[in-house]
Amino acid sequence: MNRRGFLKATGCSAVSLFFSRSLPAANDPKERILEQADERIEKHRKDNAVLKIIGADGKPLRSGLTVMIQQTRHKFLFGCNIFKLDRCRTPEDNAAYEKQFAALLNFATLPFYWWNYERRQGEPEDGRTEQIIRWCEAHKMTTKGHPLAWNYVDPRWLPDEPDLAMQLQLRRISRCARKFKGDIDIWDVVNEATHYDRESVKKQAPILTEAIRKMGVGSYVREAFRAARKANPNATLLINDYRTDPAYADKVISELVSDDGWPLYDVIGIQSHMHGAYWSPQKTWEACERFAKFGKPLHFTETTVVSGEQGWELRKKQKDPNFRWASTSEGEKRQAEQVIEFYRILFSHPAVEAITWWDFTDQNAWQRAPAGLVRDDMTPKPAYNELLRLIKGRWWTTAGGTIGTGSLVHFRGFFGEYEVSTRIGGRKLTGTFRLDKKTREAIEVRLKA
């Protein structure tokens, strides 16, 4: 049996046990999963560090000098789609959107839906993408493109020839990944391939759906990832799906390997839209454990918890002009409680590296649901405020220290980027450094005026 056959048979990679050591089982009671969350966060998201503080001239600073150590960015990616940037109802809404997005998050998902992005063949809407990229750069926001391939709606101009349609799809993947190399280096390459042939997409995307059927799901995802990798060899490539059952692993992930059996993907993307019902801690943990067995990082790519009535059937009522899926006080309280629980569980799992919220504001949110972290009028919901307290408070490091022997300062902090500062003779000196899991030796920090 070759490596690919072994992976298909076992449903995991050679490093499948890496993320699952000493963790609770998926069928453990809710209390154990939650009670141990802070302990796991302390273990997996923080570390001890030693800083060697030197001056602008490269010489050690004197012992006894006090320094402040301030985190400026998380390594973990806390994100949201950024579809409404500069597209809110009023200039005031746009300003509020930008301010609150930047205050909370460090990761933005940009739209690349083919049928919208290239409404006329050969005329992609790159200008809008470049506008968002510039904003993200100005706010030190990591970017991701979503998605390069998804048979959800056929572009109107797509020829009704499956083989040609697939050629155009692969060409499109290459073009986007190559054009935005350096600006967007994280991509959802293929979206929702597990159940690619469900009835709704057969109606909306008959050409692409038939092209996938004819090519075969395994060949389709492999060729898509090869095209993206060739266009941007250093990109982080995700497979993404709403299916969290074994079918995703068996039908797609286990197929997404080279002839020698090595994964063609870098990250496994998991959608978690909870319009109908909130996931229990056990279900959330089970999803993490199921896909961590592949030995690759996990991104929760599309997370929704509504702040109003729950139920997928409510989207069907949108045709009624008198119906509004509204946010409520009770729903907002429930949303906040569930969001904090969900994020604590995910942040405590060592395989998870990113969480992306789906729709920052209720304005034109997907399914017209009250899914935002901020309301229709751009005021923050309790969920936003609670996340801010976690991400920039409880999970954020601010520390003081005194330079000791050898110009060293010891501290413990969350992984991410930091600024160190001190004052000498009325002058403020600052320097920066990065702390991550790979940091083992003393980090040299040069302080300058």
Predicted regions and their residues:
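Glycoside hydrolase catalytic-domain groove-lining segments
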Residues: 130-137, 211-239, 247-320, 343-347, ...
